[in-house]
Every structure is written in C-alpha cells, then in structure tokens.
C-alpha cells in the first residue's frame, strides 16, 4: 500500500474561493449615528423628567418682581414739555404772581374765582409783605449824606410810593364790614401805623405831604374801627386790650395827627376817652386810670378805711 504524502499548506495560504459578504460603510455610519442620537435623546428626556419631578430641589433662582412705586425709565426717550405740576415747582413767587396776573387780565372770570376761593390774608402775612416794601425803601437810600435831604428823597421816591400804595391797598381789607373782628382790625392798624412813624421827615416841606396824608387816612381807619368796636359788648375789646394807651401813644408820636381816633375813643367810651385825652395832653404821671389801678392792685388805696361793725 503506497501512501502518498502531500505537503501541508497553512489555511491562510489556501486559495479560498468563499468570500465574506461586503458591508456598506456609509449605511453603517448612518446607522451608528442614528443609534447615538437616539441614546442622547433618551438621556435628555430622562433628565427633563427628573428635573420636572422635583422642582422644589432645583437651585434655579426665580426672577424678583420690581418693587411697587418705582417707575421704569421710558425706552422711547424724546423731548417733551414739562407737566404742569413740575412746571409750577420751578416758578419763583414773583414769576407765579406775574403769571396769574397775566392770566387774570385775559380771563376776568378766572380773576373772580381766584378772589373768591383764595384764603384770606392774615395779619402776619400782610405785615410781612409791608415789611418787604419797607426794607426795599430803606435799602434804596444812598450811602453817606443826610437821609432827609432832597437828594435822598429823589433816590427813594419810587420805593416810597410803592410802600404807601401797599398801605392804601391793604388797609381797607382789615376794616369793617369786610373784617368783623375788632381785635384783628386794631392789631393790623397798630402795625401799619408804626410803619408810618418810621418814615423820615424830609428837609423840604412839600416832600412831607405823603406822610401827612398817610396819617390822615390811618386816623380815619382807627376812628371807624373804634366806632364799631364800641358797639360790641360795651367796647370790651378797647377796655381790656390796652388800646386806649396805644392810640394815645400813636397820637403823641405823630404830633397830634391821630386826634380823630382819640376823639372817637373819647366819645365812644366816655371816661376812658377822657383819661386817654388827659394823658395825651400831658397829665401828671401819677394819674392812673381805674383800669390800671385794678390791674396793679392799688385801686382804693387813697380812700379812708371804714371803722366799725359792717
């Protein structure tokens, strides 16, 4: 038996006609990318589910609402006029007064409404206005020289006229029947008369006519108020307000130009008017009125004391 030996050939060197099936590389890559994308989508969906399942544990900061009362700045900024309240805030008292006067001149109905609705001027506010006119008058005097000279008079003539005109305009407001309270009228007249006292006596006689006329008008105003005050409660406002002494003092400072007011006081209150006229004419200093004796506790000190049973 003859055995034939064949040479051994390794398998990888054999001529193998059976081939493995070929694969499409592009389809493989697209398949893998699709699987990867699906896995990512599934993972993100899980994260969303976990986030939505426990919102209380989320560290996210919620937006805060803007506090009330704060206005947001307008994004469409453009030029525009001021609102009326803001415009009025920028006006000075003089500008406001000039504006109102101009409007009232064009619209008389508005003028009447302002007069009827505006608050009544008080004594303090009115005297403050008069004090401003007086301060302007005093500031107009030139430096050096005599304050009563003709040169000084010419320098302050305009301010003097403004002061006297303001007195003429304000005084009737505090007279009856517009003012019903005698105490209010008397208090204003007291302050206004002191302003006239402080006016200078000019070297030229003709220049003093302004002051003389002011005294005459003020004396008439005093007489009117005294007459009305004497009708109310027996003139108690005059008796216990010390107005008899004040009127006598005004008459003394003015050189007797307030005599009309003194005469009205004498006629309206009788004995009190006599006491006032005597003191104004230069009565002895130890002559005291009954009211003064009562206030000082000396009433009846000069009368003899009664003796015996009562």
UniProtKB/Swiss-Prot annotation:
Listed GO CC annotations: cytoplasm; nuclear membrane
Polar residues composition bias: residue spans: 14-33
Alphabetized Gene3D superfamilies for the sequence: Tethering factor for nuclear proteasome Cut8/Sts1 (1.20.58.1590)
Keyword field: Cytoplasm, Nucleus, Protein transport, Transport
Any one of the GO BP annotations: proteasome localization
Spans traversing the lipid bilayer: none
Domain of life: Eukaryota
Biased composition (Low complexity): 52-63
Keyword Transport: yes
Region called Disordered, residue ranges: 1-86
Example of a GO MF term: proteasome binding
Subunit structure: Binds the proteasome.
Name of the protein in question: Tethering factor for nuclear proteasome sts1
The gene coding this protein: sts1
